Amino acid sequence: MRLLLLSLALITAHPAAAIRARDFGIAPGPMPTGPLNAITDVPGMAVGQVTLDRGDTIRTGVTAILPHAGNIFAEKVPGGIFVANGFGKLMGLSQVRELGEIETPILLTNTLNVPEAAAAIIEHTLSQPGNEGVRSVNAVVGETNDGGLNDIRARALSIADARRAIAEARPGPVQEGAVGAGRGTIAFGYKGGIGTSSRRTPEGFTVGVLVQSNYGGRLILAGVPIPPPPGKTAARVSADGSIMIVVATDAPLSDRNLTRLAARAMAGLARTGSAFSNGSGDYAIAFSTANSVRRTAARRAASTAYPELGNEATTPLFIAAADATEEAIANSLLAAEIVTSREPGTDETRRAVALDQALIRRLLATAGQPAR
């Protein structure tokens, strides 16, 4: 029974190595990556994931992103959100835009489990020492609709699952592909999922990105068009869908410049062939982990301003965000494996195929970009 239960909820805190974009020579931009080429290269960052594979219909999960290891409510981080197309249900959006700060872990999941993820964030926040008097929590939860592979109406993710993702969040490598909130997602007709990347700017700052890819258009990798899956034409691959992009940096930015940073993630998204369609939810959340700009009660009482980088220092960070987003999306697709499920109430098998790695290598080589 214990082995069965473990198979139902796979915790992905200690990932194995997977195929990544750089294995194909895909390395957008001039800047180097951090040691892990992941969002967790930003100091203090942690990621936790719970993947749910239940029976032949449940293919979903949750991914937790923690800006720092302390009490996030007591040490809020400045943040900004950019929306390219708003067909989505990003919880917490209005208060982040109004106040320019994030006070909770960020959770990503499927559309119909946003309430459970929010409840987990609220329970986690209220349970933290020092938060005994808290009466308002702005839970930030992003989502994409994984109903193409997952029985989304079953709302399989529990509050306990989401709390476990928060509790299991760790620094270090981040598993990519069909895991966590990316278990049931599809992008460009292929299996999508979780992907991450990072950049180090010449000034010594780090920008890290994590994506949950579940969107459409015509796939482009390193400037090379990639054909749709076998048996499908470009016209039959839906342009709809969504993507959640989380951008973290240790640069001490204001919430206004973090909103600008979030906007630059869309440049990376566009390079991958996104349609930005009517039915797409294209969201980017950006925040700074720099201790000097954290919003604490003591700092609010003692000062009216925080030491932060000026506008003229943002360009390298903007470039880093775009490049890391492009690579994170490529990683989400290249790391994903084939996922199958059954259409609820029928015997119909649903299947999302992975990118054909041999084909990708040939196409890149033909375009003059041979794999490393």
Locate predicted features.
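Bacterial N-terminal signal peptides
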Residues: 5-13
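Positively charged n-region of N-terminal signal peptides that target proteins for export
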Residues: 1-3
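Alpha/propeptide regions of enzymes that mature by internal proteolysis
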Residues: 17-372
